[in-house]
Amino acid sequence: FKNRKKYEETYDYEKGKITREQLLDKIPKEELKTVINKEMSEATIKGIFNTIDDIKREKEIDKIDVIIGGPPCQAYSLVGRAQSSHMIVPMEEDPRNELYKMYVQFLKKYKPRMFVFENVAGIKTARGGAAFKNLQTYMKRVGYEIDYHELNAQDFGVLQSRKRVIIVGWLKGTGYEYPSFDVIHSKAEVWDLLNDLPALKPGEEAIEHTMTDMRRLKKYVKDNDIRVKSDVLTGHIARPHTAQDIEIYKRTIDMWFENEQHERLKYDDLPEDLKTHKNRTSFVDRFKVVEGDMDHCHTILAHLSKDGHYFIHPDIEQHRSITVREAARIQSFPDNYYFEGPRTAQFVQVGNAVPPMMAKVIADKIKEQLEK
């Protein structure tokens, strides 16, 4: 939107005052056409190419400078809570395991000067490493030199340990290279991301910030434009929890903060009346508190859409799992980034995302090379 009135209409949508259809009616049709929301498959890719080609002609775009993206993570992901055992999700029956070939088809057709391909660390070992080797071979075959590194969002100023494989490619003969990144370690704590948000009990919701919250605002949140100049607050709805879960959450938080070693609660540590699962080996680390007093927390996962036991809010007075907005802040999303759909879908969006602070640094480095 190019003026303040249109900008305010987005807030009306976020507040639920107008429908999505009413909002889209106010956006110029030529802009809406540039957003292509279609499933990627062999059956649809030709039509997607045709749509892109039409847009290129209408906007008189000759060359594509850069393509950025990556197939959905789940097909290559280390299994949620079994990450420590390095188990890989079975891929043979998952159609998403071929999506990297779709990505290469875009490279082959549009020949961007550079590209960025992002995925989870598990892609390197999926199918014994064959999928990753094939991907690199296909990229080179269509005319690219490539390099890859496993990068951690924590090194980009994000208050979260989040490892991702980033492949950068450039057309042969262009002289580009894999960017070098300066490590950015913030002195902030994860608490700084949570303190100024309204406190919630299980099942409660807050739809706006308060002046009290503003007084708790931390430098990290202001400096990185996470808190915006608006009272609108979306996605800050706490899940309801059973009395049993609440009691377990309190014990989990207590154990984390009661000693400097920050011990995690193990399932067998619970009294018998709180143990409901027979397979206790699988649930050994089922409950985990977000590390509020540290400079980073564990990786935000799409599994948040299933339950929040692995992401318990560190404030024992709130005794609940984190909200979509809190997860988004840990991912470094600004508060005015609106997640659509039901809460489960929002958690999936947040859990699968690249942290914006990390993405911006990578994008700036790519832009520097393209502008030389």
Where are these regions (language model features)?
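Short alpha-helical segments and helix-capping/turn motifs at coil-helix boundaries
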Residues: 47-55, 150-154, 282-286
